[in-house]
Amino acid sequence: MNITTLTLLVLTPFLVWRIYSRLRTAMARQRSIVSRHWTGLLVFAAMVLVPASELLRRLDMLGWLALGTAAGLGYGVWAFQHTRLEATAEGYYFTPPARLGIAIAMLFTARILYIGFEMYANQGSNVPTPRFTDSLLTMLAVGLTGGYFGTISAGLAAWRYKIRQAIG
């Protein structure tokens, strides 16, 4: 083991802790901003559609991506039903269920970190770096994350649209 590997092993827990603390604050009560909801919907839809376009000829991996997306959509619908929506004099606010959102985001983060470690471990060797779409666990994590957060974003955008229609 060289010094770079040791540094990587020591810094990884700090990175994970920092990501977790950022997610915890992101899952607290937030002001509802319509443009962010639409941006979230587009980003998370692209997060699923871009790998799907790569996997059109590999139906097995496309199936894993679809399974992850379906699970993410299901969890997203359940989570949106448990999201606290508030219309106050100061503005519109929402509070998503923190535990599920943090768990899904940390699962995705763990998968990305694993890919990074794999690339680091294989550098300088003759082992080819696998493509992002070669792992069924990665496709499950991408689908789950994109489906979940895309559904939450779509639900929030629809909520704000209904409020706007009710106001006139």
Language-model features, listed with the residues they occupy:
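Alpha-helical transmembrane-segment detector that highlights a single hydrophobic TM helix
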Residues: 57-83, 95-96
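Helix-coil boundary and interhelical linker segments in multi-pass alpha-helical membrane proteins
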Residues: 1-5, 51-63, 132
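Cytoplasmic-side transmembrane-helix entry/capping segments in multi-pass membrane proteins
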Residues: 28-42, 62-69, 91-99
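C-terminal halves and exits of single transmembrane alpha-helices
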Residues: 73-89, 101-118
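Structural signature of hydrophobic alpha-helical transmembrane segments
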Residues: 1-14, 62-72
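A generic, lipid-embedded transmembrane alpha helix
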Residues: 37-56, 107
